[in-house]
Amino acid sequence: MQWLAIGLGAAIGACLRGWLARFNPMHHWIPLGTLGANVLGGLLIGLALVWFERVGSGLSPNIRLFVITGFLGGLTTFSTFSVEVFTFIHNGKLLAGLGLIGLHVGLTLLATALGFYFFKLVL
């Protein structure tokens, strides 16, 4: 049952990531879809951490696997982020690559903290 929960969550997360990828060409040096997927994933994992701690403790562990390992693992995309940064650096756009690293890491950490602390206030 664990593998089914993870697989189903991953499929849904990957479909959302695929939909968000439509926004990648909108800006010439910021792949907005990848950035959006990672920032949204950061926000949602912050919310999920608090929710599972406060509300979801009595739930089946498969639900946590579905949400965190499956859905959020399928949604967020470190490998795509890595190849986008590498492509900039390989094409001589070092500052763009470094800027992209800063955007992804900074915004994702900020979103995680916002989700975490917002849900702590609400629950």
Swiss-Prot record:
Gene Ontology biological-process annotations: cellular detoxification of fluoride
Binding site for Na(+): 73, 76
One Pfam family hit: CRCB
Gene Ontology cellular-component terms listed: plasma membrane
Compartments (UniProt record): Cell inner membrane
Signal sequence range: none
Documented activity regulation: Na(+) is not transported, but it plays an essential structural role and its presence is essential for fluoride channel function.
Protein name: Fluoride-specific ion channel FluC
Organism (species): Psychrobacter cryohalolentis (strain ATCC BAA-1226 / DSM 17306 / VKM B-2378 / K5)
Lineage: Bacteria, Pseudomonadati, Pseudomonadota, Gammaproteobacteria, Moraxellales
